Amino acid sequence: QCDLRYPTMRPILFIMAMQSIVFCEKYDAQEIMDIGKRGDNYRVWLYFIDKKGSIPIVVDQRTIGRRSKNGVETNGLWYDLTVSKNYIEQISSLGIMVKNESRWLNAISVICTLSDIERIAAFPFIEQIKPVLGYQKRSDIEYPDISPHSRDFDYGNALEQIEQINVNELHEQGYTGSGVRILVMDTGFKLTHNALREINVIDQWDVVKDDQETANETDEESAVGQDYHGTAVLSTIAGNQLGEFIGVAFDSEFLLAKTEDVTQEIQLEEDNYVAGLEWGEENGADVVSTSLGYLDWYDYSDMDGNTAVTTIGVDIAVGLGVVCVTAAGNSGSSSWYYIIAPADADSVISVGAVWEDGAIASFSSHGPTYDGRIKPEVCARGKQTWCVNPNSNTNYSRLSGTSLACPLVAGAVALIIQARPDWSAMEVRDAIMMTASMADSASNTYGYGILNAGSAINYGVVAGSD
């Protein structure tokens, strides 16, 4: 029998129950607890339903030109509209820390508690809440102790890796990367080595700490070698010390983004990756080199080119005219031997690693993607690659990993763009794949083979047209 003293109680309880169901549909609590946990809190993406009150950002003139070349009109572009400041303010008013904003995903990443998530879900402008995927980075570079020595030619010991991908031919034609802007995203960058002191750095951003210092800033960072990996990677592109070491695209302009925090248990955060990518694109990057990858929490079925946040970010960047180059991964000898995100993107150039003689490195990750596409795209020297020793201002080392193969290809891309400035991002990618050493017999070990930069610039070019 109905209690007439509380005539509205049941409808109210029903409404509350329905609201709870709606809120829970916005997120999977177990998924957030399993994946998003960071210490006592959780790191999650908040996806918004719209961009209400958004305004367009101001992008570099180079960005406008690059987009136009790729058929993209900047005026009114949705990707340039900021995330709603009103929505962010309402989230911040709860005392929640906002880590990153993504115009491309129309989302922000935050650090919060589980009870915060319940309150956030009640906002009508929240479309979905997902955990930020992180990666507990395992050693992906082999660090042998080799005494440096040089040869009697200008490239020094870098000659072999330069000749293997036929970059020397482009250097001889005067293509050294001049006028091309490269974004390198990594752990940090120490620019005190003799081979790096003269590089043309346009801007730097530490995404982790939100400042402009990408070298080690703390004793803890120095102790764990925060900027070691990034410095070695950068040197293969930008290094220039005549007779000792010459990188692939030493005359290029550089944007440097520090997107990893190796002092933490979770070192690679996908929201930092996307933030760095958006920053580079709006600041005129023509090429992106990322020797970073994400595997934890993903299944092979997720390597379909459409699932991982970093993969989606890369596809957007390429759509805006940026050539994105990424390491295939170093899982070739493990139970998971496939490529890792964002190498599964259908627009990226993923890079495998080979020895000096062209044999595949055992650690180099394989394809195919879950939907059957060949991976990697191409290969370059990733076993005993010659680069600067980040612990010294004068010495060099031989290091191994697809992390070292990736920047060699990214540097070559810069030379191709310099030689063929009218080519779109996908035309550059096609040229690289179709002129590689195994283009007629591509496989999921080598992809389309070892890059041939000298042939790539002539792909599809009619004789006498230059």
PLM features per residue range, with description:
Residues 15-24:
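Hydrophobic h-region of N-terminal signal peptides that target proteins for export
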Residues 122-181, 194-197:
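Protease zymogen maturation seam
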